[in-house]
Amino acid sequence: MARIGDGGDLLKCSFCGKSQKQVKKLIAGPGVYICDECIDLCNEIIEEELADADDVKLDELPKPVEIREFLEGYVIGQDTAKRTLAVAVYNHYKRIQAGEKSHDSRCEAVELTKSNILMLGPTGCGKTYLAQTLAKMLNVPFAIADATALTEAGYVGEDVENILLKLIQAADYDVKRAETGIIYIDEVDKIARKSENPSITRDVSGEGVQQALLKILEGTQASVPPQGGRKHPHQEFIQIDTTNVLFIVAGAFAGLEKIIYERVGKRGLGFGAEVRSKAEIDTTDHFAEVMPEDLIKFGLIPEFIGRLPVVASVTNLDKESLVKILSEPKNALVKQYTRLFEMDGVELEFTDDALEAIADQAIHRGTGARGLRAIMEEVLLPVMYDIPSRDDVAKVVVTKETVQDNVLPTIVPRKPSRSERRDKSA
């Protein structure tokens, strides 16, 4: 045991040798002592090693095929969007590695620029989930922002720098790590210019926000208020370089298909309209033929579109895809609710026609995959309320009638054990 002095009553740190009078705190272990200063030093070393381990390394970065296969385990359908995202993300992190490792003049002569991503598609088709799954696989900081809350600087609402604050918070305020993260900006179609022609009045939540986003999308040294909110001159700012931040912006872009139809020679309205059934319209990829001029006509400014060179479109989910979403992914809803019932000692079963009926309702409501959970909650609410208070239920079976006609799920009673039968007969 480490002691100082003739009396042997003055303890000292076993690592740095400082006495208990020279440090704030001395913690005892079996035969050893450690001071608060050595503990702080150990924490710093561990944090540095963890930060180094979390960095995305090129030799460890999954190839586009592997990225797509990983997405397949969580997201059903949207094959074109998966391929586009896989290639774009792989190239983005290759570009970061090339910037860090290029030292000879030949490599430095070629500067690889950033390719941000624009995702188009109806609500509930997996745009946000695709981006979240990507970030999970790559182990990089990931932040989601809502474009509808943003306004031009000086007006009521959020500044665009608050988006960067969310990314810094996701990286535990490690700015270096945040500078290689991913930011997903949703509802970007809601900041479209209110009219195709420039207006005399300021459009502070539309074109003004697009203008404010230009610099951070392209790459700039931004000053971010550490507590969020508006900037004021008496506060410290966090400096972050957005050059290597990958931006994925997404929106439903309702009405864009009519603009595309007009351009390619198909009339969307009137006597010359091409007549198609609703089923055909729902399963058609409206945005496969989108061009920059369509987005400009919709209300995005040319400078904004130019900073989003990669376009990935997602399609409406058909009935077959929704049924697969319910049961096949690793965290499918059926598996989630089955696990919830297992915790109460009850087995849960969905018939095939019940899953099809749930998919039909989601299509009818127009909510896509996002509406599946709401339907499941409605169907299972009565039994989820009663079952925890009962010990005579072995199994719950959800049928087509349960979904369509609000009939209670079939409850299979549990057979009493031998001891329970003996007690009952006694």
Curated annotation (Swiss-Prot):
Q: Which residues bind ATP?
A: P122, T123, G124, C125, G126, K127, T128, Y129
Going by the entry's taxonomy, the superkingdom of the source organism is recorded as Bacteria
Which Gene Ontology terms of cellular component type are present? HslUV protease complex
Ranges for the ClpX-type ZB domain? Answer: 1-54
What SUPFAM superfamilies does UniProt report for this protein, alphabetically?
Glucocorticoid receptor-like (DNA-binding domain), P-loop containing nucleoside triphosphate hydrolases
What GO biological process terms are annotated to this protein in UniProt? cell division; proteolysis involved in protein catabolic process
Supply the alphabetized keyword list.
ATP-binding, Chaperone, Metal-binding, Nucleotide-binding, Zinc
Q: Which CDD domains match?
A: RecA-like_ClpX
Q: How does it assemble?
A: Component of the ClpX-ClpP complex. Forms a hexameric ring that, in the presence of ATP, binds to fourteen ClpP subunits assembled into a disk-like structure with a central cavity, resembling the structure of eukaryotic proteasomes.
What HAMAP family does the annotation carry? ClpX
| Protein name per Swiss-Prot or TrEMBL | ATP-dependent Clp protease ATP-binding subunit ClpX
